[in-house]
């Protein structure tokens, strides 16, 4: 498809993929091609390069100039699907497909979740054969529209994690690399893990073994 200034461009990225606590959030941002330059002006960059305060401020600015959509996939849903032999890439692709079908872009740029870019590209292309598809590793660093999606996803996950903290207390960042998260998991007695925890994660298996 030949893209012009009026073409609708969609960026997609996720937050919380590797987390053991909390949801996986997929974010989509849709803008006309001619308006993408405004993302530079409001300070859009990969969400990992921004602290929480800056992400929140920029997220509000993105929402004023673009259409956006978030898909929240709770921990217990991830577990249910994985227990039915649906892997994390497939779970995430389902969420991306939902965003694409809702937003109907002319072109879609995605931070590739597969080790093989071509294989992932073909999966996304099947969703809409008439759509231009770009799937690259580190697309969130290369394309501003994907950076914007990464900010939207990360801010929503931050919000979801805060809701979790209000109910369950200090859970850290939710990632296995966070000592505070591991310490929280170790306080859970008799392996009665609440639904905010991804029980199918290797982290939980290791903790369960260590407390036996």
Swiss-Prot record:
SUPFAM superfamilies: Ribonuclease H-like
GO cellular component, one term: ribonuclease H2 complex
Note on cofactor: Manganese or magnesium. Binds 1 divalent metal ion per monomer in the absence of substrate. May bind a second metal ion after substrate binding.
Sorted UniProt keywords: Cytoplasm, Endonuclease, Hydrolase, Manganese, Metal-binding, Nuclease
Substrates-to-products reaction catalysed: Endonucleolytic cleavage to 5'-phosphomonoester
Residues reported in the UniProt entry to bind a divalent metal cation: 13-14, 111
Location relative to the cell: Cytoplasm
Cofactors demanded by this protein: Mn(2+); Mg(2+)
BP GO annotations: DNA replication, removal of RNA primer; mismatch repair
Record has Cell membrane as a keyword: no
InterPro entries linked to this entry: RNase_H2_suA, RNase_HII/HIII, RNase_HII/HIII_dom, RNase_HII_arc, RNase_HII_hlx-loop-hlx_cap_dom, RNaseH-like_sf, RNaseH_sf
Family to which the UniProt record says this protein belongs: Belongs to the RNase HII family.
Family matches, as NCBIfam families: ribonuclease HII (TIGR00729)
Entries under PANTHER family matching the protein: RIBONUCLEASE (PTHR10954:SF23), RIBONUCLEASE H2 SUBUNIT A (PTHR10954)
Primary role: Endonuclease that specifically degrades the RNA of RNA-DNA hybrids.
Protein's UniProt name: Ribonuclease HII
Organism field: Methanosphaera stadtmanae (strain ATCC 43021 / DSM 3091 / JCM 11832 / MCB-3)
Lineage, broadest ranks: Archaea, Methanobacteriati, Methanobacteriota, Methanomada group, Methanobacteria
Gene, per the UniProt record: rnhB
